[in-house]
Amino acid sequence: MLHFVANMKRAVALWPFTSHRHFTEEESKRHIPFQRVAAAACGAGILSSLAYAPDQILMTLTGGGVFSLSHSVGVAVCVALVFTLVVMSYRHSMYAYPRGGEYEVTYTNIGPSWGILVAAAVIIDCVLTVSVSVASAAQYFVSLFPFLAGKHVYVACAMLCVLAAIHARQRHRMRALWAIPTYFFVTIIVILLITGCIQLLTASGEGVFVAVPPQIHEAPVSVGLAGYILLLRAFSLGCTVMTGAETFSYDVYRFPRPQSVRAARSLSKIAACAGLLLIALVCVSQYGDRLISPLTVESSGTYPLSEAVSQKARIPVIMQVAHRVFGPQTLGTFIVVIATISILFLAARMVFHTVTSQVSVLALQGCMPIYWHHRYSRFSGAYAWMLLICVAGVVVVMTQANLATLIHLYAVAAFIILTVSQLAMIRYWNTQLRERQTGGARKQTLRSRSLNIVGFILTSIVFVVILATEFIQGAWVTLAMVVFLYAIYAAYRHYHTKLEYEVNVNQWDEACRVPNRVRAVVLISKWDKPHMRALAVARASGAVTVEAVALAVSATAEDLVREQWRELGLPVPLTILYTSKRDMVALLSDHIRLVREQYPHEVLSVYFPQVIGKYWWESILHRRITRALRLAVMDIPDTVLTLVPWKRAN
């Protein structure tokens, strides 16, 4: 059976390969990628949000008419400015804790409870990142191939399987390929925007882009509180562009030395690039297409606005712009879609490393079982990301791969992480200020603390805005999942702490006392080689007494057992238990308890054989009495279970 399980594991992970964590220092240097490669890989999470963040801003503002839609660029600029300030303050955590991530920052400075909360939010954020990425990729794929309309769930699940296959067979030599999707996506989007702007500026008459449809002109020009709430909702949905920033804190080790400096610079460059591209996409969409293009709505206004929006919402903004610039079903549009899907794939795949690292740290800190720590098994990391794939698949199926529904769940966990980590860094700088520092160092510390205070205020405001505007739409689900996972981690940590206290060895602990004597009991169900081998091992163990215990179902069977025992002539006392219509496991465990009560200061060693077959399927053919008896005897104190294997001959 063990060989069958091992073969099943190998079917998933295929051939083994060396982990870079076990290399020497010189060998590890050769496996660290260039800064451009590491920055592109880590920045995929931020840049991939450009595939759906502009859609959410424009789709939200379309419901408010001209007044709201005219502020789309302002909303994008606000998102970019807030993102810039948050990144400026977030960089300090990479300098202070280059290998810890948000969990270690919070765990060290605020306490274990807050650290567990951040860890739960990180896991939920990773699940939602994979779900949103594959749902968005499926939306682009279905938009490119219309015959797959209505099959979003199947396409997203197929993409999850492809992601699992790619991640299972990654190689260190393939790390240079990580940069290709990021640079390819940025290059294609820049070309798309430049071409669109040139066509928009040089167009005359009808032009390449169309103006606002007549239905939107009929919307009220001035709105009250509802319009401003709509702007806040658009801002909160646009803040999904910030959700990939926490990836850098977990992947600082991927950068060449000095790792913290290079990681912080790369984060700043990626954030600036994402902010500029977000503003540019929203500008082109607002002044060009207004989200509703002639591809689905005629300029004469034959469709009502709600129906037009529902039809056009299925086509992402980037693809709409590509349709207007390059034309539908052209090579340019195909390249744009492929570039977008590739960056979404890379963003989802990079999350696997974050989950594996976070789960490993949690296991090491006593918040999860220790076998989840990757250093103890090369399959423990595979368990983490395979579970991530399964949970993400469940989320995709439950939401029907609806990107709008997933976006409402998405940003909550990310801003829990950002807000709590900013608070932890404020505590960190307060601790540094209590120490004696020179004038220059103290000024630098005060400046860093001020930036983190600004970052904490901004992330708190954004978090409150997200909760206020998206709570009913689904933010409460994310909060519930984070609280549920936090409760599991906290409960296991409490159990682990109590267990460590109970098993802790003191100098005069009772567990250190040497028992007076050891008694052996051999369970015999029939006279064969496995049972005789178990009896021989028990006699050779040096026990003060060895007792053979056999079972008989009738008086005739009891006489036969005694006759066979006399023929063997072994100098071992025999005890026969009568088991007519009674559970033999319960009868044997009762006898062992009776022997244990008669000799309370001695250790009782129970021997029983087990036949080991040559093939995995042979274990199915044998009785399960050995396992049931082992479970029953384990509850008896000061009782040692000894399994004597008997392997079949080849």
Residue ranges and their predicted role:
Residues 1-28, 497-650:
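Cytosolic C-terminal regulatory domains/tails of membrane transporters and channels
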Residues 2-59, 95, 106-109, 113, ...:
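Membrane-interface "cap" regions at the ends of multi-pass membrane proteins
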Residues 58-108, 113-119, 132-159, 273-274, ...:
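Extracellular loop-to-transmembrane helix junctions
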Residues 112, 152-158, 254-277, 360-397, ...:
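Loop-to-transmembrane helix boundary motifs in multi-pass membrane proteins
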Residues 183-243, 295, 300, 469, ...:
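Helix-loop-helix junctions that connect adjacent transmembrane segments
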Residues 185-216, 282-290, 419-436, 491-500:
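Hydrophobic alpha-helical segments and their helix-loop junctions in multi-pass secondary transporters
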Residues 197-207, 265-319:
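Extracellular/periplasmic helix-exit of transmembrane alpha-helices
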Residues 371-383, 418-471, 509-511:
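C-terminal membrane-solvent junction of multi-pass transporters and transport-like membrane proteins
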